[in-house]
């Protein structure tokens, strides 16, 4: 890439989806399987993966991706997979299956032991990257609805790799003081692009606050700012909205995102559509929160639907001008404690494509009224 070449619109980002085979529609976008396969096929030096857990062998397509990684590692490509300390259940089996892949467990909060690595992203050769809500599991690759973004624009990939370096510094095998030293080294160069300096209309946001580093944007700040500035419409497709934070088994009220949604509907007359998931991974407060939003805003233009098939898509669109794709629920525990990276864009084409996905999901036979 020439150093003074113009930045392509949308930083060459393409939307990526996993759609279960039992859905009544298909995607026009790259599949997660195709995305991961392309990253592996084109890799020449390294592939770095961050995921809460690693269970690719649970489906046939997941196993195919893992076999491709194994082949790449045997050819000398450096492969590192970051897992959360509490997501390593299948680690022994995977290590025995492929000893050339370096699996590293991380603990981003050794002091309080409440934070998890929640981020889902891949980076290869500082040239290609994926970020979204597909973890490195067979389900995310094949049987659970997910949404992410793939780019082969090197500056964006390099910026995401800096996040990988940050999470890697919290290797759970290291002593705490080594974690702090490693983090201190990588945080000052933590990002090149942010809300005030997007590249091609694209930037990343981060969580939690203690991992921000120099010039990174806190994800919750950006999300709440966008909700509070919404003028016409807010479309949300999420597994859950939970206005609480859990610490040591106790729940504490965390209304920041919840209140911003209510204020937009009641105070400013913003049209809001909320599509929530309804499956066994839901927080106990999730459906109660959805019903409370529906009840509080009964005199306003707020609609709530439930998606009946396993849906881990986490998507926010504001005023048809901004799109946010993340791996975190709108959940106080996630935003206060967990480590993740979110994708943000104001590029018109990317926002339009994300909007079409939301519209498709909203009117599909899998979306049911909350009142039914």
Swiss-Prot record:
Query: Where is this protein primarily located?
Result: virion
This entry's comment on induction and repression of expression is: Expressed in the intermediate phase of the viral replicative cycle.
PTM per UniProt? Palmitoylated. Attachment of the palmitate moiety is essential for correct intracellular targeting and protein function.
Q: Which reaction does it catalyse?
A: a 1,2-diacyl-sn-glycero-3-phosphocholine + H2O = a 1,2-diacyl-sn-glycero-3-phosphate + choline + H(+)
EC code = 3.1.1.-, 3.1.4.4
UniProt family annotation: Belongs to the orthopoxvirus OPG057 family.
Name listed for the protein in its UniProt record? Envelope phospholipase OPG057
Q: Coding gene?
A: OPG057
